[in-house]
């Protein structure tokens, strides 16, 4: 998508001084996540695993000489008892409590389990490494089953034991990808607003909260200083789960006309919130709509009417008849990647992180974010436990360039951390809370990310 610079209506403050909203250069990088020429012909998921292993193995092979140059690199089939070597492959975690689809089919659909565990970890879980030649069970304490998940590609230093397992002595991960050098910090600051989990149409949704947020962004609340800050907001990203449709309407039954209209009500309400005209004594201009005031990206989430499997494709623009008339409105993919003034943003609506919390453990959600960067993969558990499209010749979730901002939406609370890589990479990690529950949106300074 070509770069975009837009003119926006000026804002006025109490002193009648006009404030012009700042502008930024936008570049969409979602092409990798778009399913355009892909055709489903009944292919299996093995091909996406082969593509992932091929790409990651090439990368890890290039890192081995600086890690353990004195050791030979072997395949699983070439392992010899007691001989130290390095093997590269895809991890598979054998989990005692992992739900089995065959068990689900064997139960009656109407019977729900009494307990739905939020985490399927068990002390008897163990890891297996697999390549094209075979698989081997892993032992030792260097590779904790509680940290790793199925789908991660690693290099392991160790040796085969008499029991036929591979005793791991050291682990090499891909590490943070290279990062494009950021432009020098500018004195002219700009801000990006992230909000997720609006859940319009749910019982927990409060339109008044969102209205207050819109008023802040458009410069209709606060004193001169706050309105001056609003003029520095150059972009808004809605990170998934914008609406929530009653499950009673999604049971696969034919709907009467009344229920059919109820399906679209949440989107009608959201579109109105994004396009309504604000009345203000500060200005005579009637164009103060958030969709017209600044560029707006909207990503699909797990509760939105989009395809279930990742990467989720953009929400159909016909759902937003009012917002879609503005060239500042963009319906984007999930995951979503873009650049603002050469600052790279990468993020998801939260499904990848939610799945990691079910099959591994960490002290906080930011640790999960950091791991995906070090593994260079946005969704390592896909397609094992997280639905994704069966790509045949590529894995779109591989991270080949380190973002400056890495965000994930629909989390329980706001968290942030600055991650520093071994080669000088600096990444601002952000967990964006559900707005319907917390009333919190996240404002990110584009040129002062380390702050």
Regions found by a protein language model. Name each.
Residues 1-451:
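Extended recognition/assembly regions associated with phosphoester-bond processing machinery
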